[in-house]
């Protein structure tokens, strides 16, 4: 069977650009990643009752999940994998650290009991990443991942709608697409959950700086490649101000959680 879901070709930046972005973001990531930590905690809360002996933290970033995974599974051999060596250098919890690509895992077939990934697969060809997860999981092994859905950063799309025709966010898969791709990858007992997380910022510049600080400002084809004029920035800023709440300017994370078994 082949997937009816076309890869979002050209909508993701190159691996080199992703790596460079997260290399630059590594020093600021932890200070800016409050929502990312919250999502990681929610992902852990949904895990089934398992006792893995070998687990992978795929796209581990600075390793926030590692302390949680170590506490929960103290006897497991843990591999923390990320595309960015700079991120890996900041993983403090003792584990096996590996620089690698989620689409080409440097792991043997059927070597994992748990494939864990929080907010990393949105940078990948999801169909390929899920096939790699299936390949490396043992029979009965569990995948638990968090990704982002289509409503993510909709405020940015609103802000720039009348400014230009460039893309200002990644193209994200819907829950239905993620479910279908997981099934096509050979995964079973698929459970999809959703949550909405909203960050608030005092002004538009701070919002944009926060996106950059977590490395989420890289886009693929269709992105703006030239500097924005002052008038264009002010137009986007004015549009974003229309969305202001008493808490500040909102920025939405449309979070999708996938749990499944091989």
UniProtKB/Swiss-Prot annotation:
Catalytic activity: malonyl-[ACP] + S-adenosyl-L-methionine = malonyl-[ACP] methyl ester + S-adenosyl-L-homocysteine
Pathway listed: Cofactor biosynthesis; biotin biosynthesis
Disulphide bonds in the chain: none
Enzyme Commission number: 2.1.1.197
One Pfam entry name: Methyltransf_11
Molecular function via GO: carboxyl-O-methyltransferase activity; malonyl-CoA methyltransferase activity; S-adenosylmethionine-dependent methyltransferase activity
Entry keywords, A to Z: Biotin biosynthesis, Methyltransferase, S-adenosyl-L-methionine, Transferase
Example GO BP: biotin biosynthetic process
InterPro entries reported in the protein's UniProt record: BioC (IPR011814), Malonyl-ACP_OMT (IPR050602), Methyltransf_11 (IPR013216), SAM-dependent_MTases_sf (IPR029063)
Matching SUPFAM superfamilies: S-adenosyl-L-methionine-dependent methyltransferases
Top enzyme category: transferase
Methyltransferase is among the record's keywords: yes
The family this protein is said to belong to: Belongs to the methyltransferase superfamily.
Function summary: Converts the free carboxyl group of a malonyl-thioester to its methyl ester by transfer of a methyl group from S-adenosyl-L-methionine (SAM). It allows to synthesize pimeloyl-ACP via the fatty acid synthetic pathway.
HAMAP family, alphabetized: BioC (MF_00835)
Record protein name field: Malonyl-[acyl-carrier protein] O-methyltransferase
Organism: Dechloromonas aromatica (strain RCB)
Gene: bioC
């Amino acid at each position: 069977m082949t997937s009816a879901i076309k890869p979002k070709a050209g909508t993701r930046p190159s691996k080199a650009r992703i790596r460079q972005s997260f290399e630059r973001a590594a020093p600021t990531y932890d200070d800016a990643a409050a929502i990312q930590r919250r999502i990681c905690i929610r992902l852990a809360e949904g895990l089934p009752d398992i006792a893995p002996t070998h687990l992978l933290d795929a796209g581990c970033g600075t390793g926030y999940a590692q302390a949680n995974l170590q506490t929960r599974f103290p006897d497991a051999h843990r591999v923390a994998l990320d595309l960015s060596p700079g991120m890996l250098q900041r993983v403090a919890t003792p584990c096996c650290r590996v620089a690698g690509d989620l689409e080409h895992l440097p792991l043997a077939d059927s070597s994992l009991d748990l494939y864990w990934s929080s907010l990393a697969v949105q940078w990948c060809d999801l169909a390929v990443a899920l096939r790699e997860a299936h390949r490396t999981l043992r029979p009965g092994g569990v995948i638990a991942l968090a990704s982002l859905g289509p409503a993510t950063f909709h405020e940015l799309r609103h802000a720039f709608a009348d400014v230009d025709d460039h893309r200002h966010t990644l193209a994200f898969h819907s829950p239905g697409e993620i479910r279908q791709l997981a099934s096509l990858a050979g995964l079973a007992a698929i459970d999809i959950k959703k949550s909405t997380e909203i960050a608030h910022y005092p002004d538009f510049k701070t919002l944009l700086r926060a996106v950059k600080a977590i490395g989420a400002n890289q886009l693929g084809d269709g992105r703006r490649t030239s500097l924005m004029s002052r008038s264009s920035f002010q137009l986007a800023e004015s549009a974003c101000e229309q969305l202001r709440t008493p808490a500040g300017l909102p920025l939405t994370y449309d979070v999708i959680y996938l749990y499944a078994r091989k």
